[in-house]
């Protein structure tokens, strides 16, 4: 079987896709004669979806050099009043024996050159060491978030109080290399509540990043603030010990698959042909990720702001969440679009706007000549897709580490305009604020400057993956460390 690189994905489609993209990049550079890729993944998580096996079959068929090994089903230890992340982290730990047996079995017929794990799979780090396999982390975030996560154990050490970050409304924290401080309430969602077991899990994960052989990051050097890269390289983020090598190998983005011929395929094709008829850089695209969702009251404010702005738009609307305070929905359940939007909105904006339900082919949309701006939840994959397409953003974070991303996009990278959210109202944004930010991006001189900057970054993104690009060079350095 020769040399193999083993990747271990956290539960959930997004994590598996990211590992696949990394595997593809390695093999496309070196060829399957140099390395094969084996991806380990779990079975039975509460975040599993029916789309995962479909995706894996497709990748196995189109990329035979990538093999998948699914672990036996493990039952979630669901306890009342425990958060979904805490349940998931416990579930991952229960899979440790399967990690050990998989590495043992693979090692019988191949040389495992590297074991690359997701941050949430940190309990597998000592297992890799047990087999004397160089073990690396793969971070699907920017360098600024990596800097923050490396430094988080230090902040935990300095703030040994009984208060949670979510309650420290007047407190801000500084991270090495960041231009501006971060509100305590805007910390990564996993650490907001000190009483949630996910808090101590996250501190444990972050404290183990420096104990790996290195960290591979889905970003590219030219995108990142030099002060952040210097802070990481100079050891400022891990003041009490050495920082491992960091390899920036992005932007790694999933290739847009063909539009599925489902019941909604015609609508998706309609939105692409509609975009083709619009003037250059005139359309604002609004999409909040695969799970981002708003209650009906917020949807109405967005609609009012879009209508008042007078701008062209393509807006992906998801079904409002069942729980009013939630900002996530799973799946693409059908719903009555007219019922969640202001009466007559669709008719009044029909000449300059289009609303689609649940999903649009985002990578394809962002690359359309007519798209001139992107309202995003600041998920890192979406950010990279916009950067590659050269499209400036309006940053509207919802959950996870998205508030941290917003800070960096607006202040450090200067590629986005931030919306003003009412933290005391769950991040609510008024229709007037929507109109103001839309006009700022699409009409103002500041928006034009942002657009020019993003266009140049798009060219740099392409160059980074080229033969002499920074990300290719960093991949070569990573491979040199394992061969």
UniProtKB/Swiss-Prot annotation:
Which UniProt keywords are present, listed alphabetically?
Glycosyltransferase, Transferase
Q: Which PROSITE patterns match?
A: UDPGT
Q: Which reaction does it catalyse?
A: phloretin + UDP-alpha-D-glucose = phlorizin + UDP + H(+)
> According to its UniProt record, which residues of this chain constitute the active site?
15, 118
**Cited InterPro entries:** UDP-glycosyltransf_plant, UDP_glucos_trans, UDP_glycos_trans_CS
Enzyme Commission numbers on file: 2.4.1.357
Q: Which residues are noted in the entry as an anthocyanidin-binding?
A: 15, 400
Q: Which residues participate in UDP-alpha-D-glucose binding?
A: 140, 360, 362, 377, 380-382, 385, 401-402
Protein's UniProt keywords contain Transferase: yes
Provide the GO MF annotations for this entry. Answer: UDP-glucosyltransferase activity
Pfam families, alphabetically?
UDPGT
Q: What does this protein do?
A: Glycosyltransferase that possesses phloretin 2'-O-glycosyltransferase activity. Converts phloretin to phlorizin (phloretin 2'-O-glucoside), a potent antioxidant. Is specific for phloretin and does not possess glycosyltransferase activity toward caffeic acid, catechin, chlorogenic acid, 2-coumaric acid, 3-coumaric acid, 4-coumaric acid, cyanidin, 3,4-dihydroxyhydrocinnamic acid, epicatechin, 3-hydroxybenzoic acid, naringenin, 3,4-dihydroxybenzoic acid, quercetin and rutin. Can glycosylate phloretin in the presence of UDP-glucose, UDP-xylose and UDP-galactose.
Q: Family, per the entry?
A: Belongs to the UDP-glycosyltransferase family.
Under what name is this protein listed? Phloretin 2'-O-glucosyltransferase
């Amino acid at each position: 079987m020769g040399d193999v690189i083993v990747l271990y994905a956290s539960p959930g489609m997004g994590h598996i896709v990211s590992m696949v993209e990394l595997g593809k990049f390695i093999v496309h550079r070196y060829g399957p004669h140099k390395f094969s890729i084996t991806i380990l993944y779990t079975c039975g998580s509460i975040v599993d979806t029916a789309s995962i096996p479909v995706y894996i079959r497709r990748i196995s068929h189109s990329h035979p050099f990538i093999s998948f090994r699914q672990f036996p089903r493990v039952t979630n230890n669901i306890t009342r009043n425990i958060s979904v992340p805490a349940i998931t982290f416990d579930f991952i730990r229960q899979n440790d024996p399967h990690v050990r047996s998989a590495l043992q079995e693979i090692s019988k017929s191949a040389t495992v050159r590297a074991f690359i794990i997701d941050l949430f799979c940190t309990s597998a780090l000592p297992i890799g060491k047990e087999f004397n396999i160089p073990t690396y982390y793969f971070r699907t975030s920017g360098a600024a978030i990596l800097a923050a996560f490396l430094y988080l154990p230090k902040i935990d050490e300095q703030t040994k109080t009984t208060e949670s970050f979510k309650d420290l409304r007047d407190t801000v924290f500084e991270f090495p290399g960041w231009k501006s401080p971060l509100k305590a309430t805007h910390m990564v969602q996993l650490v907001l509540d000190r009483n949630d077991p996910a808090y101590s899990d996250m501190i444990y994960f972050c404290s183990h990043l420096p104990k790996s052989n290195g960290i591979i990051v889905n970003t590219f050097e030219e995108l990142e603030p030099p002060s952040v890269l210097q802070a990481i390289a100079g050891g400022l983020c891990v003041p009490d010990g050495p920082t491992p090598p960091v390899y920036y190998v992005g932007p790694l983005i999933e290739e847009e698959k063909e539009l599925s011929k489902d019941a909604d395929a015609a609508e998706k094709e309609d939105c692409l042909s509609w975009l083709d008829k619009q003037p250059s850089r005139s359309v604002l695209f609004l999409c909040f990720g695969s799970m981002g969702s708003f209650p009906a009251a917020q949807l109405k404010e967005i609609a009012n702001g879009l209508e008042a702005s007078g701008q062209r738009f393509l807006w992906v609307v998801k079904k409002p969440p069942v729980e009013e305070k939630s900002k996530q929905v799973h799946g693409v359940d059908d719903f009555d679009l007219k019922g969640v939007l202001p009466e007559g909105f669709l008719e009044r904006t029909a000449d300059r706007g289009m609303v689609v339900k649940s999903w649009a082919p985002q990578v394809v949309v962002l690359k359309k000549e007519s798209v001139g701006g992107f309202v995003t939840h600041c998920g890192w994959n979406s950010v990279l897709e916009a950067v590659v397409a050269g499209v400036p953003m309006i940053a509207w974070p919802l959950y996870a580490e998205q508030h941290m991303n917003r800070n960096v996009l607006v202040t450090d990278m200067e590629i986005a305009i931030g919306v003003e959210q009412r933290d005391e109202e769950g991040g609510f944004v008024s229709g007037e604020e929507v109109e103001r930010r839309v006009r700022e991006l699409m009409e103002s001189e500041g928006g034009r400057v942002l657009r020019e900057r993003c266009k140049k970054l798009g060219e740099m993104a392409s160059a980074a993956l080229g033969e002499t690009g920074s990300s290719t060079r960093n991949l070569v350095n990573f491979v040199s460390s394992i061969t």
